UniProtKB/Swiss-Prot annotation:
InterPro entries: CEFIP, DUF4585. Residues 149-160, 389-402, 479-493, 522-535, 609-620, 650-667, 751-772, 1194-1211 have a biased composition (Basic and acidic residues). The modification Phosphoserine is found at S323, S470, S816. Keywords: Cytoplasm, Phosphoprotein. It comes from Homo sapiens (Human). The keyword Ion transport does not apply. Residues 1182-1193 have a biased composition (Basic residues). It is found in: Cytoplasm, Myofibril, Sarcomere, Z line. Residues 727-741, 1055-1066, 1083-1093 have a biased composition (Low complexity). This is Cardiac-enriched FHL2-interacting protein.
Length: 1435
């Protein structure tokens, strides 16, 4: 760490001195500090304190002497511990040295040996402040100059007693030695052993924060946000409540010299804070109060944490800095206690400031007291900002309290994940986090300032207020901001992609936020107003002026920042639930404005929101609880910080367990989460709290930041690695995944659901809608997405039921898979509910809220996947938002997680979607039973089986068979039982709504049976299912939108296009795309799961399932589309759906072709997004289209046909998808089933409006498949219903068949109109070889494909005309045959022939009403089979 220290030193021309003095520990601190300082400087913060921290002990003492003199003066006046305090200050210097350089710890303190262990923490804390705050030995550097300015300012105030301070500093240690010896040692050993080192680090941070705070209130705003956040909030909330906080926060270190500690802590913190922030006169009263506090603190020393909180609360009234101490002490001592006490306080106050709330609990006077104190304290340094200080004082009080509460949580959150907050470490995990604390803490500094800088700018009003207000406020602001931001930042750092994506999404979300759902915005505003009103009394309007409660997004941001950076983030993130824009801004705000939101506010508010939801059952309550949550958030955060504080923490039913679980869950999570996953993600996640409740946590959440913070974790459950996604963490999720994450997820999910349910009661219906949209955007914030689903489900007990089901299943799965499952389940089932509910609510399709984490939280994880994936997500989003916000939302969310995460994640999603939806409908019990049954299979089997369980025929044939019995409608013979039963069971067992899902599921299930040895039965089942479920699907289309807890989610994905063909035209695209993804994820995942369990032997368990998954996805699309009308329309729709990526643009329109494919097909390109497509979504759609267009432009024929292709790619893409997905699924199944297979779809979907990327890969066979009647590149499919011809431009099939070579990125044009044999043969190898990057060995397949393609094309010509039914049947057949062929023939030729033969047999049974289907099916199957075989045989 010397390097970093040297950096600081060099920068300050103090390297030699520092280098010589600092030991490893000091260097470590210095290095971290230096980095943090640089970051802070970058973030427009003069945080040279970090560098100063590196200052040698002597300098530390010097600075401390001067610095401490003032502080000690305060403390002495206050607590009359002058002798103790100065000596303690010296000790602190020693401590700073100790922390910075352990040797100095001994060498730098004469009395150190005396009170070395006990006072060390205190010393460190105080000393670090001196060292960090006031290292005067670095005057050369600009930082040094700034520090000098601070010193001068401070000196001007403390020069009167600089000497006195210093000598007392020396005197104090002896006094402190006994005190610390007794109390600190006890507390230190019991809970602060780790704090001992951490406090020094935090102390340094705090002092650094405070010194700039003194010098530059604004600088402190940025620097202190992290520094103060770390120091003040971590263990140096004592900066605000030096004595109280130090005592409370570091009850052991500071409680030891309780008598002198208040002074000392006060002196140290006040030194850096009050000296710079407040006048000495103001400090004297404070010192007296602190003295009292110190007196109280010693008593609380033994309880350390509890006493800490109590003392802190008691001192807190005198100084709101106590709030941080209290909160953090509470956090440290007992999450429950904090939750009980601080939360109770918070709840009663209903303020955003946990500190204020705590004060209210401890004493209503504290609120005014801190104001008074702060006002007096602020004048000298903050007098120029006194105008604001009146507000800021209150706000600082609020801020400090909020930050204290949130700081503790943020610190907690951070300290666990980043372990940057010593206090948090000391308090919550005093022993464990301390070690980690140093790096995370400094990293937070590094990261926080940048985002806080944004955030500060964002909440310039409030942030300056924060800076301006008294040091406690500043410290709190910074501290709170820092925990959150640092966490977030760490998360973001961990998930750089998340940050990038988040920035993009932030813009989108801001767009969505402001243009998306006025109602929700209004609601959010109202909620904010209420919260602000509640906080207002505490902050005396600081929030109002700074955070303008009236302005929901911006002012909330500012308001909360006014409260404290974290608070500012909290409001935006809290309110985003109410305001999609805010969630969107929130998720991304979390990422952009600050991980603070994701971290501290997220969690604090998330937890608070959750509790508020439980208690208030309304957004306002939740927002209200924001502060309360902050107050007790530390508890939740305590457990969750490592997981996905940001995203998950938001919804924490149980403070620690639930919060932790949630944190893990979503961030994992939001997402960003996560979610910024997005990391957070943990993706992760009331606006924000509600969002978090709605699972904006990050997911992934993040929150996104959570990922980093916690894993640096992953945002929240899903977003954390970007926000908790498999890439989320379950994809790059924040969790130290595995057991903890799962538990957290479970907690979080359940709590979130409950929260959301209650939130709904609070009129969050709109919010839900908004959050649905939001979530869409913040899929990265899987938590958000989950939260959204949960919000919608909160009114549905089923949501919890599903979630539990999901959790049950997820628990069985592997840790990562579990995470993914939970996320997936969350998202899936929540999404199912959300989808339905969103449709019911018909929320404005603001895609502000989807990110995560996936972690599923935002798109971060997926974005992390290929760029195409993000594009796809926008397409999905757009479509989803347009036609069925929920549907698209869910679809896109689920697919993303699958893409981002493993099949496990995907499976859980589907699982939950299917299972949740099913239980919602009629099969809750059965689904549960199935899920449990499936749960028997651990890992993928369990996950997939569980999904299958959702689908009645999950477990291979057995569940299907029983399900067949269960579903009266199951007319498929037992041989088709697996798939048929799944379909029928779902169709028959559940109503049409359920049927829709079952279709998907059957699609999934069918592949298993079909793949293995039931292709014929499966096909008949498919045919039948197409008919019955087709009807049901249609039927369900309407209900799907209506009923909130429907199985529709999967069916919605599959049916979204079908049922919502008019209104869901766009949904069709998203549905297609989502179905595609969802099929891929939900049906595919389930399919995959069933296949995996069932076909473990037939296929390579994973490959077949994987291929089947895609295939099934296509099949599901086919079934739903084809069976909906059981017409070409359905087939067309299936096609539309099938080309999820390829059809995304086209599918947007075809999306609605489930009922009227023609219409959407017409709209496909231009009106691909039907009704309400938020500009953001539109943008995403456009972007996807652009990508597709580029490819098409490369091969202009493709581009032209892109338009006609819009209609065409759907059917064609279905074929492609069926075949293509099968191949990718099949093969990737073996390799990395979900990820691999998903990325192609992602490419397909996101890249295009036509499955060009997909086409590229599987395009060879696919394009060959379309080759039949029309040019290989174009497949003209007629919608029998509308009679409209859709030219599906298959990326690899244009009139001049243009094959896209993914490897070279070039388009190979081969004229393959009718001469499929001649033209297609040569190109297919090229196309296959080139376009099929994934399947380079496709060349043989192309030949095979060409052979079938000829048949296909021959059959296809008629098929196009009678494509509707035929294509539908063909697709189903193709799926069946495809699977059958895959199972039957691994060889390309075998594939072609068997598919042709098998397809026909399957075709007729599959679609009894579709006689002509055989031809199209043959073509499709040929491609599919070829691809599959190519994948299977060639690979």
């Amino acid at each position: 760490m010397m390097q970093g220290n040297k950096k600081c030193t060099d920068a300050f021309s103090d390297s030699s001195s520092i280098g010589s003095v600092l030991d490893d520990a000091d260097r470590e601190v210095s290095s971290l500090t230096d980095r943090a300082f640089r970051s802070l400087c970058i973030s427009e913060d003069t945080s040279f304190h970090d560098s100063y921290l590196a200052v040698s002990p002597d300098i530390t003492r010097q600075v401390f002497g001067t610095f401490h003199q003032r502080t000690v003066g305060h403390t002495q006046r206050k607590s009359g511990i002058w002798s103790q305090l100065p000596s303690q200050g010296t000790e602190h210097s020693g401590w700073a040295a100790t922390f910075q350089q352990l040797p100095k710890y001994v060498q730098g303190e004469e009395k150190y040996p005396k009170t070395s262990p006990p006072p060390t923490p205190v010393q460190r804390r105080l000393e670090v402040p001196v060292s960090g705050l006031r290292s005067s030995n670095k005057p050369v550097s600009k930082v040094s100059t700034l520090i000098k300015s601070f010193d001068r300012t401070e000196s001007q105030r403390c020069e009167s007693r600089p000497t006195a301070s210093k000598p007392p500093a020396l005197k104090n240690p002896p006094k402190f030695a006994p005190l610390p010896e007794n109390s600190v040692n006890f507390c230190f050993d019991s809970a602060f052993l780790t704090v001992r080192r951490v406090p020094a680090e935090v102390s340094n941070t705090h002092q650094n924060s405070y010194q700039p705070g003194r010098k530059h209130g604004e600088q402190e705003s940025s620097k202190n946000p992290e520094m103060a956040c770390h120091g003040s909030s971590s263990f140096l909330p004592a900066a605000n409540d030096t004595a109280t906080l130090c005592e409370s926060k570091f009850p052991s270190p500071h409680h030891k010299p309780v008598t002198g500690e208040p002074g000392r802590g006060k002196g140290t913190f006040l030194h850096s804070e009050n000296s710079a922030f407040e006048s000495w006169n103001a400090h004297q009263p404070k010192l007296l109060e602190r003295k009292d506090t110190a007196g109280t603190v010693p008593e609380s020393k033994a309880p350390k944490h509890y006493g800490d909180t109590t003392l802190l609360r008691e001192p807190c009234p005198p100084e709101r800095t106590v709030s941080p101490c209290q909160v953090q002490a509470s956090c440290s001592q007992e999450e429950n206690r904090l939750a009980a006490g601080a939360l109770s306080t918070s709840i009663p106050w209903g303020c955003r400031d946990p500190g204020a709330q705590v004060f209210a609990v401890e004493g209503k006077a504290p609120s005014s007291q801190p104001d008074s104190q702060e006002k007096p304290a602020q004048p000298p340094w903050r007098k120029p900002k006194t105008g604001k200080k009146g507000k800021e004082s209150l706000q600082d009080t609020l801020e400090e309290k909020t930050q204290t509460n949130q700081r503790g949580p943020p610190l907690y959150t951070k300290h666990n994940p980043q372990e940057q907050f010593s206090e948090n470490n000391a308090l919550d995990l005093p022993v464990e986090p301390n070690e980690h604390y140093d790096p995370p803490f400094n990293i937070s500094k590094l990261l926080t300032p940048i985002i806080p800088s944004k955030h500060a700018l964002d909440s310039a009003d409030s942030q300056p207020a924060e800076r301006t207000p008294s040091p406690p406020g500043q410290l709190n602001g910074y501290q709170e901001k820092e925990p959150s931001e640092c966490q977030s930042r760490d998360s973001y750092k961990s998930k750089a992609p998340s940050l990038l994506f988040n920035l993009k999404d932030v813009r989108k979300r801001v767009k969505s936020t402001y243009s998306s759902s006025p109602l929700l915005k209004v609601l959010d505003e109202k909620t904010r107003g209420k919260v602000d009103g509640k906080q207002e009394p505490v902050s005396n309007g600081v929030i109002l002026p700074n955070g303008l409660e009236e302005s929901p997004p911006n002012e909330l941001s500012k308001e909360r920042p006014a409260d404290d950076p974290t608070a500012s983030h909290i409001n935006p993130q809290k309110d985003p639930t109410a305001d999609p824009s805010e969630p969107s801004a929130d998720s991304y705000l979390t990422l952009s404005t600050a991980p603070t939101i994701a971290k501290a506010p997220f969690y604090v508010n998330g937890e608070a929101a959750e509790r508020s939801s439980y208690e208030n059952k309304e957004v306002e309550g939740e927002l209200e609880m924001g502060p309360a949550g902050s107050s007790w958030c530390p508890d939740s955060r305590e457990h969750r910080p490592r997981k996905h504080l940001s995203l998950r923490l938001c919804n924490r039913d149980p403070e620690p367990g639930g919060a932790t679980e949630k944190m893990k869950t979503h961030q994992l999570e939001n997402g960003l989460s996560r979610s910024v996953s997005q990391e957070t993600e943990p993706e992760r996640e009331a606006g924000l709290q509600n969002t978090h409740l709605n699972q904006k946590f990050f997911p992934g959440p993040l929150s996104p930041e959570e990922e980093d913070v916690f894993y640096s974790d992953s945002q929240s459950d899903f977003m954390p690695s970007l926000k908790g996604k498999a890439k989320f963490s379950t994809s790059s999720s924040d969790q130290s995944f595995a057991s903890f994450d799962d538990q957290q997820k479970m907690w979080f999910t359940e709590n979130q659901r409950e929260d959301r349910r209650k939130d709904v009661s609070a009129g969050d219906s709109q919010k839900d809608e908004k959050e649905n949209v939001m979530r869409k955007d913040e899929l990265q914030y899987c938590a958000l997405s989950n939260g959204h689903a949960c919000l919608e489900n909160r009114s549905q007990g089923e949501a919890l039921q599903r979630e539990r089901e999901s959790v049950s299943g997820g628990r069985t799965r592997k840790a990562s898979a579990e995470e993914a499952n939970f996320r997936g389940s969350w998202i899936g089932e929540n999404k199912g509910t959300t989808f339905s509910q969103a449709k019911d609510l018909t929320p404005s399709p603001s895609s502000a809220s989807n990110r995560h984490m996936l972690f599923t939280i935002k798109d971060n994880t997926l974005r992390a996947t290929p760029v195409i994936k993000p594009i796809m997500l926008p397409l999905l989003r757009t479509m989803s938002l347009e036609d069925s916000l929920s549907s698209g939302h869910k679809e896109e969310e689920l697919p993303r997680p699958e893409w981002g995460e493993d099949p496990g994640f995907c499976a859980p999603e589907n699982q939950d979607i299917l299972g949740t939806s099913t239980p919602t409908n009629t099969r809750g019990t059965r689904v549960k039973c199935m899920a449990n049954e499936v749960m028997e299979d651990p890992g993928q089997g369990s996950s997939m089986a569980r999904m299958e369980a959702s689908q009645p025929a999950p477990k291979g044939n057995f569940p299907s068979m029983p399900l067949v019995g269960e579903g009266d409608r199951v007319k498929a013979p037992p041989d088709a039982a697996p798939g048929l039963v799944a379909s029928n069971c779902k169709s028959g067992s559940a109503d049409s709504g359920k049927l829709a899902a079952p279709w998907h599921i059957p699609t999934i299930a069918l592949p298993e049976g079909d793949i293995e040895d039931q292709p014929p039965p499966w096909q008949p089942e498919n045919c039948w299912e197409e008919q019955t479920p087709g009807f049901k699907s249609h039927f369900l289309s309407t209900p799907r939108a209506g009923p909130p807890g429907r199985r529709l989610v999967p069916s919605e994905r599959a049916n979204s296009p079908n049922p919502g063909s008019p209104g869901e035209s766009s949904a069709c695209s998203p549905a297609a795309s989502n179905i595609w993804e969802e099929s891929s994820q939900a049906p595919g995942g389930p399919e995959l799961l069933p296949e995996e369990p069932n076909q473990a032997s037939p296929w390579a368990s994973s490959s077949p399932a994987r291929v089947t998954r895609r295939e099934d996805l296509t099949h599901a699309l086919v079934w739903e589309g084809g069976s909906d009308p059981l017409l070409e329309l359905s087939a067309e729709d299936l096609r539309t759906l099938s080309p999820r990526g390829s059809l995304l643009d086209v599918a947007t329109s075809p999306a609605g072709t489930s009922g009227r494919l023609e219409l959407p097909a017409q709209l496909e390109r231009t009106a691909s997004k039907p009704p309400a497509v938020p500009p953001k979504t539109e943008k995403a759609l456009r972007r996807a289209k652009k990508l597709a267009s580029k490819r098409r432009k490369t091969d202009q024929a493709q581009e032209k046909h892109g338009e006609s292709q819009e209609g065409k790619p759907c059917p064609e893409d279905l074929e492609q998808t069926q075949q293509r997905p099968l191949c990718p699924r099949e093969r990737p199944r073996h390799n990395f089933p979900v990820v691999r297979s998903l990325p192609p779809p992602v490419h397909r979907h996101s890249v295009s409006g036509f499955s060009e990327p997909v086409g590229r890969r599987p395009g060879g066979p696919q394009s060959l498949t379309p080759l039949p009647a029309y040019p290989a590149t174009q497949k003209v499919l007629q919608d029998p219903q509308s009679g409209e011809y859709f030219v599906f431009d298959l990326p690899l099939q244009v009139k001049i068949k243009t094959f896209y070579d993914p490897e070279t990125g070039k388009y190979v044009k081969v004229s393959i109109p009718s001469s499929e044999g001649a033209s297609p043969e040569p190109p297919p190898p090229d196309a296959l070889a080139a376009p099929y990057v994934l399947y380079p060995g496709f060349q043989p397949v192309p030949v095979t494909a060409l052979m079938p393609l000829r048949c296909s094309s021959q059959l296809s010509a008629p098929t196009f005309l009678r494509q509707g039914p035929r294509a539908s049947a063909a697709r189903a057949r193709t799926q069946s045959v495809h699977e059958s062929g895959l199972q039957l023939d691994p060889g390309p030729h075998g594939d072609c022939t068997p598919h042709s033969a098998g397809q026909r047999p399957h075709g007729p049974p599959q679609s009894p009403g579709e006689e002509g289907v055989e031809a199209p099916g043959l073509g499709i199957i040929s491609t599919d089979d070829l691809e599959d075989f190519a994948t299977e045989g060639i690979s």
